[in-house]
Protein backbone atom coordinates (compact mmCIF):
# COMPACT_ATOMS: atom_id res chain seq x y z
CA UNK A 1 0.00 0.00 0.00
CA UNK A 2 1.29 3.47 -0.86
CA UNK A 3 2.37 5.59 2.09
CA UNK A 4 1.11 8.94 0.85
CA UNK A 5 2.05 10.82 4.01
CA UNK A 6 5.64 9.66 4.38
CA UNK A 7 7.68 12.45 6.03
CA UNK A 8 10.29 11.98 3.29
CA UNK A 9 7.80 13.06 0.62
CA UNK A 10 8.85 16.30 -1.01
CA UNK A 11 6.02 18.88 -1.11
CA UNK A 12 4.36 19.43 -4.45
CA UNK A 13 3.77 23.07 -3.54
CA UNK A 14 4.84 25.19 -0.59
CA UNK A 15 3.98 28.81 0.19
CA UNK A 16 6.03 30.88 2.65
CA UNK A 17 4.64 34.24 3.80
CA UNK A 18 3.06 34.64 0.36
CA UNK A 19 1.04 37.74 -0.43
CA UNK A 20 -0.66 39.26 -3.49
CA UNK A 21 -1.22 43.00 -3.90
CA UNK A 22 -3.42 44.70 -6.50
CA UNK A 23 -4.13 48.43 -6.96
CA UNK A 24 -2.43 49.29 -3.69
CA UNK A 25 -4.43 46.76 -1.67
CA UNK A 26 -3.41 43.37 -0.31
CA UNK A 27 -5.80 40.68 -1.53
CA UNK A 28 -4.15 38.13 0.73
CA UNK A 29 -1.00 38.19 2.82
CA UNK A 30 1.18 36.07 5.09
CA UNK A 31 0.05 32.68 3.73
CA UNK A 32 2.03 29.59 4.72
CA UNK A 33 1.16 25.99 3.86
CA UNK A 34 2.40 23.08 1.78
CA UNK A 35 0.82 20.13 -0.03
CA UNK A 36 2.48 16.74 -0.52
CA UNK A 37 1.41 13.74 -2.56
CA UNK A 38 -1.76 12.18 -1.18
CA UNK A 39 -2.40 15.15 1.10
CA UNK A 40 -5.63 17.18 1.14
CA UNK A 41 -5.56 20.84 2.15
CA UNK A 42 -8.85 22.77 2.31
CA UNK A 43 -8.97 26.56 2.08
CA UNK A 44 -12.09 28.06 3.67
CA UNK A 45 -13.29 31.61 4.16
CA UNK A 46 -16.02 34.07 3.16
CA UNK A 47 -16.37 35.54 -0.32
CA UNK A 48 -13.45 37.82 -1.17
CA UNK A 49 -11.19 36.32 1.50
CA UNK A 50 -8.41 35.40 -0.92
CA UNK A 51 -9.06 31.67 -1.38
CA UNK A 52 -8.97 31.61 -5.17
CA UNK A 53 -6.12 34.15 -5.23
CA UNK A 54 -4.12 31.88 -2.92
CA UNK A 55 -4.82 28.82 -5.06
CA UNK A 56 -3.82 30.65 -8.25
CA UNK A 57 -0.63 31.80 -6.54
CA UNK A 58 0.12 28.24 -5.45
CA UNK A 59 -0.06 26.86 -8.99
CA UNK A 60 1.74 29.77 -10.66
CA UNK A 61 -1.13 31.61 -12.34
CA UNK A 62 -0.36 34.62 -10.12
CA UNK A 63 3.05 35.70 -8.84
CA UNK A 64 3.37 36.64 -5.16
CA UNK A 65 4.27 40.26 -4.39
CA UNK A 66 5.94 39.14 -1.18
CA UNK A 67 7.12 35.83 0.20
CA UNK A 68 7.76 32.95 -2.16
CA UNK A 69 6.23 29.81 -3.64
CA UNK A 70 8.11 26.63 -4.46
CA UNK A 71 6.73 24.01 -6.82
CA UNK A 72 8.01 20.56 -7.69
CA UNK A 73 9.85 20.62 -11.01
CA UNK A 74 7.55 19.53 -13.83
CA UNK A 75 4.45 19.73 -11.61
CA UNK A 76 1.26 18.74 -13.47
CA UNK A 77 -1.88 20.44 -12.22
CA UNK A 78 -5.50 19.45 -12.81
CA UNK A 79 -7.98 22.28 -12.20
CA UNK A 80 -11.74 22.33 -11.64
CA UNK A 81 -12.86 25.99 -11.82
CA UNK A 82 -15.48 27.56 -9.60
CA UNK A 83 -17.39 28.68 -12.68
CA UNK A 84 -17.14 27.61 -16.30
CA UNK A 85 -18.53 29.90 -18.99
CA UNK A 86 -20.50 27.69 -21.35
CA UNK A 87 -22.77 28.91 -24.13
CA UNK A 88 -25.75 26.67 -23.44
CA UNK A 89 -27.22 27.45 -26.86
CA UNK A 90 -24.39 25.56 -28.57
CA UNK A 91 -24.29 21.75 -28.67
CA UNK A 92 -21.57 20.44 -26.36
CA UNK A 93 -21.30 16.81 -25.31
CA UNK A 94 -19.47 15.56 -22.24
CA UNK A 95 -16.95 13.92 -24.55
CA UNK A 96 -16.27 17.23 -26.31
CA UNK A 97 -16.03 19.05 -22.97
CA UNK A 98 -13.14 16.75 -22.10
CA UNK A 99 -11.02 18.07 -24.98
CA UNK A 100 -11.70 21.82 -24.66
CA UNK A 101 -8.40 22.33 -22.81
CA UNK A 102 -6.38 20.17 -25.20
CA UNK A 103 -6.42 16.90 -27.16
CA UNK A 104 -6.91 13.58 -25.39
CA UNK A 105 -6.75 10.03 -26.65
CA UNK A 106 -9.99 8.07 -26.71
CA UNK A 107 -8.64 5.71 -24.07
CA UNK A 108 -7.78 8.61 -21.76
CA UNK A 109 -11.29 10.03 -22.11
CA UNK A 110 -12.91 6.67 -21.40
CA UNK A 111 -10.72 5.94 -18.38
CA UNK A 112 -11.32 9.30 -16.72
CA UNK A 113 -15.07 9.26 -17.40
CA UNK A 114 -15.27 5.73 -16.03
CA UNK A 115 -13.32 6.78 -12.93
CA UNK A 116 -15.90 9.48 -12.18
CA UNK A 117 -18.95 7.39 -13.05
CA UNK A 118 -19.70 9.39 -16.21
CA UNK A 119 -18.77 7.00 -19.02
CA UNK A 120 -22.44 6.29 -19.78
CA UNK A 121 -22.97 10.07 -20.21
CA UNK A 122 -20.16 10.61 -22.75
CA UNK A 123 -22.58 11.49 -25.56
CA UNK A 124 -24.96 13.51 -23.36
CA UNK A 125 -25.35 17.24 -23.91
CA UNK A 126 -23.73 19.23 -21.10
CA UNK A 127 -26.76 21.50 -20.69
CA UNK A 128 -28.85 18.49 -19.71
CA UNK A 129 -26.58 17.42 -16.84
CA UNK A 130 -27.50 17.84 -13.20
CA UNK A 131 -25.21 19.85 -10.93
CA UNK A 132 -23.55 16.72 -9.60
CA UNK A 133 -23.10 15.22 -13.07
CA UNK A 134 -21.53 18.43 -14.38
CA UNK A 135 -19.05 18.48 -11.48
CA UNK A 136 -18.16 14.84 -12.17
CA UNK A 137 -17.56 15.70 -15.83
CA UNK A 138 -15.24 18.55 -14.81
CA UNK A 139 -13.43 16.20 -12.42
CA UNK A 140 -13.00 13.68 -15.23
CA UNK A 141 -11.46 16.38 -17.42
CA UNK A 142 -9.12 17.44 -14.61
CA UNK A 143 -7.77 13.93 -13.92
CA UNK A 144 -7.50 12.83 -17.57
CA UNK A 145 -3.90 14.05 -17.82
CA UNK A 146 -2.93 12.35 -14.54
CA UNK A 147 -2.01 15.45 -12.52
CA UNK A 148 0.29 15.51 -9.50
CA UNK A 149 -1.90 18.17 -7.89
CA UNK A 150 -5.67 18.51 -8.22
CA UNK A 151 -7.11 21.96 -7.48
CA UNK A 152 -10.86 21.99 -6.84
CA UNK A 153 -12.51 25.42 -6.54
CA UNK A 154 -15.91 25.00 -4.84
CA UNK A 155 -16.43 21.46 -6.23
CA UNK A 156 -19.76 20.89 -4.43
CA UNK A 157 -21.45 24.19 -5.28
CA UNK A 158 -24.93 23.74 -6.72
CA UNK A 159 -25.05 20.15 -5.46
CA UNK A 160 -27.55 18.82 -2.92
CA UNK A 161 -26.52 17.15 0.36
CA UNK A 162 -26.43 13.59 -0.94
CA UNK A 163 -24.57 14.76 -4.04
CA UNK A 164 -22.04 16.56 -1.85
CA UNK A 165 -21.33 13.34 0.04
CA UNK A 166 -20.99 11.39 -3.20
CA UNK A 167 -18.55 13.94 -4.66
CA UNK A 168 -16.37 13.91 -1.55
CA UNK A 169 -16.33 10.11 -1.69
CA UNK A 170 -15.27 10.30 -5.33
CA UNK A 171 -12.49 12.79 -4.54
CA UNK A 172 -11.25 10.44 -1.82
CA UNK A 173 -11.23 7.53 -4.29
CA UNK A 174 -9.26 9.59 -6.82
CA UNK A 175 -6.70 10.53 -4.16
CA UNK A 176 -6.37 6.94 -2.95
CA UNK A 177 -6.02 5.54 -6.45
CA UNK A 178 -3.63 8.10 -7.92
CA UNK A 179 -1.79 9.49 -4.90
CA UNK A 180 -2.22 13.06 -6.13
CA UNK A 181 -2.25 16.00 -3.74
CA UNK A 182 -5.50 17.97 -3.50
CA UNK A 183 -6.08 21.66 -2.83
CA UNK A 184 -9.78 22.15 -2.15
CA UNK A 185 -11.51 25.53 -1.85
CA UNK A 186 -14.79 25.92 0.03
CA UNK A 187 -16.98 28.80 1.20
CA UNK A 188 -18.48 26.60 3.94
CA UNK A 189 -16.69 27.65 7.12
CA UNK A 190 -17.69 24.66 9.22
CA UNK A 191 -18.39 21.53 7.16
CA UNK A 192 -15.40 20.21 5.23
CA UNK A 193 -14.33 16.99 3.57
CA UNK A 194 -13.58 14.44 6.31
CA UNK A 195 -10.36 13.30 4.63
CA UNK A 196 -8.91 16.81 4.86
CA UNK A 197 -5.48 16.80 6.49
CA UNK A 198 -5.25 20.55 7.07
CA UNK A 199 -7.88 23.29 7.03
CA UNK A 200 -6.63 26.84 6.41
CA UNK A 201 -9.12 29.62 7.19
CA UNK A 202 -8.49 32.81 5.20
CA UNK A 203 -9.83 36.32 5.40
CA UNK A 204 -7.13 38.34 3.69
CA UNK A 205 -4.61 36.41 5.77
CA UNK A 206 -4.49 33.11 7.67
CA UNK A 207 -7.04 33.54 10.46
CA UNK A 208 -6.48 30.04 11.83
CA UNK A 209 -5.60 26.52 10.75
CA UNK A 210 -6.20 23.05 12.12
CA UNK A 211 -7.56 19.58 11.56
CA UNK A 212 -11.29 18.86 11.11
CA UNK A 213 -13.25 17.28 13.93
CA UNK A 214 -14.78 14.17 12.40
CA UNK A 215 -18.57 14.21 12.64
CA UNK A 216 -18.68 10.51 13.50
CA UNK A 217 -17.86 11.63 17.05
CA UNK A 218 -21.38 13.01 17.33
CA UNK A 219 -24.19 10.45 17.86
CA UNK A 220 -26.73 13.19 17.09
CA UNK A 221 -25.16 13.88 13.70
CA UNK A 222 -25.09 10.17 12.92
CA UNK A 223 -28.76 9.89 13.81
CA UNK A 224 -29.66 12.87 11.63
CA UNK A 225 -27.54 12.21 8.54
CA UNK A 226 -26.35 8.60 8.80
CA UNK A 227 -22.95 6.93 8.75
CA UNK A 228 -22.29 7.68 5.10
CA UNK A 229 -22.28 11.41 5.81
CA UNK A 230 -19.99 10.88 8.80
CA UNK A 231 -17.49 9.18 6.54
CA UNK A 232 -17.45 12.01 4.00
CA UNK A 233 -18.02 15.20 6.02
CA UNK A 234 -16.30 16.67 9.06
CA UNK A 235 -16.68 19.72 11.27
CA UNK A 236 -13.97 22.34 11.53
CA UNK A 237 -14.10 24.59 14.59
CA UNK A 238 -12.30 27.93 14.53
CA UNK A 239 -10.24 29.87 17.04
CA UNK A 240 -9.50 33.44 15.99
CA UNK A 241 -7.60 35.89 18.17
CA UNK A 242 -8.99 38.89 16.30
CA UNK A 243 -12.13 40.33 14.68
CA UNK A 244 -12.48 41.84 11.20
CA UNK A 245 -14.29 45.18 11.44
CA UNK A 246 -16.79 46.36 8.77
CA UNK A 247 -14.29 48.92 7.42
CA UNK A 248 -11.67 46.23 6.83
CA UNK A 249 -9.49 47.01 9.85
CA UNK A 250 -8.66 44.36 12.44
CA UNK A 251 -9.47 44.46 16.17
CA UNK A 252 -7.00 42.36 18.18
CA UNK A 253 -7.48 40.62 21.52
CA UNK A 254 -5.37 43.28 23.26
CA UNK A 255 -7.77 45.98 22.09
CA UNK A 256 -5.48 47.46 19.46
CA UNK A 257 -6.65 48.08 15.89
CA UNK A 258 -4.49 47.67 12.79
CA UNK A 259 -5.10 48.15 9.08
CA UNK A 260 -4.42 44.48 8.39
CA UNK A 261 -3.49 41.27 10.13
CA UNK A 262 -0.69 38.90 9.24
CA UNK A 263 2.18 37.22 11.17
CA UNK A 264 4.57 40.13 10.62
CA UNK A 265 2.48 42.65 12.57
CA UNK A 266 3.30 41.09 15.92
CA UNK A 267 -0.31 40.32 16.92
CA UNK A 268 -1.45 37.30 14.98
CA UNK A 269 -0.26 33.80 15.90
CA UNK A 270 -2.45 31.14 14.36
CA UNK A 271 -2.61 27.71 15.97
CA UNK A 272 -0.64 24.66 14.89
CA UNK A 273 -2.42 22.18 12.65
CA UNK A 274 -2.88 19.50 15.31
CA UNK A 275 -4.88 21.66 17.69
CA UNK A 276 -8.63 21.46 18.23
CA UNK A 277 -10.23 24.88 18.03
CA UNK A 278 -13.25 26.54 19.56
CA UNK A 279 -15.17 29.05 17.47
CA UNK A 280 -16.01 32.50 18.69
CA UNK A 281 -19.69 33.03 17.75
CA UNK A 282 -18.74 36.14 15.78
CA UNK A 283 -15.12 35.61 14.85
CA UNK A 284 -14.95 38.12 12.06
CA UNK A 285 -15.21 35.70 9.17
CA UNK A 286 -18.54 37.23 8.28
CA UNK A 287 -20.49 34.24 9.52
CA UNK A 288 -21.86 33.25 12.89
CA UNK A 289 -20.64 29.99 14.35
CA UNK A 290 -22.74 26.88 13.99
CA UNK A 291 -22.27 25.66 17.53
CA UNK A 292 -21.82 21.94 18.06
CA UNK A 293 -24.84 19.84 18.93
CA UNK A 294 -25.99 18.70 15.49
CA UNK A 295 -29.64 18.58 16.45
CA UNK A 296 -30.60 19.76 12.99
CA UNK A 297 -30.81 23.43 13.95
CA UNK A 298 -28.26 26.19 13.74
CA UNK A 299 -27.58 27.65 17.17
CA UNK A 300 -26.58 31.29 17.37
CA UNK A 301 -25.50 33.42 20.26
CA UNK A 302 -27.84 36.28 21.03
From Swiss-Prot:
Homology family: Belongs to the ABC transporter superfamily. Zinc importer (TC 3.A.1.15.5) family.
Gene3D superfamilies from the UniProt entry: P-loop containing nucleotide triphosphate hydrolases
EC number: 7.2.2.20
Name listed for the protein in its UniProt record: Zinc import ATP-binding protein ZnuC
GO cellular component terms attached to this protein's record: plasma membrane
PANTHER family in UniProt: METAL TRANSPORT SYSTEM ATP-BINDING PROTEIN TM_0124-RELATED, ZINC IMPORT ATP-BINDING PROTEIN ZNUC
Function: Part of the ABC transporter complex ZnuABC involved in zinc import. Responsible for energy coupling to the transport system.
Subunit structure: The complex is composed of two ATP-binding proteins (ZnuC), two transmembrane proteins (ZnuB) and a solute-binding protein (ZnuA).
Keyword Translocase: yes
Species per Swiss-Prot/TrEMBL record: Rhizobium meliloti (strain 1021)
Subcellular location: Cell inner membrane
Catalytic activity reported: Zn(2+)(out) + ATP(in) + H2O(in) = Zn(2+)(in) + ADP(in) + phosphate(in) + H(+)(in)
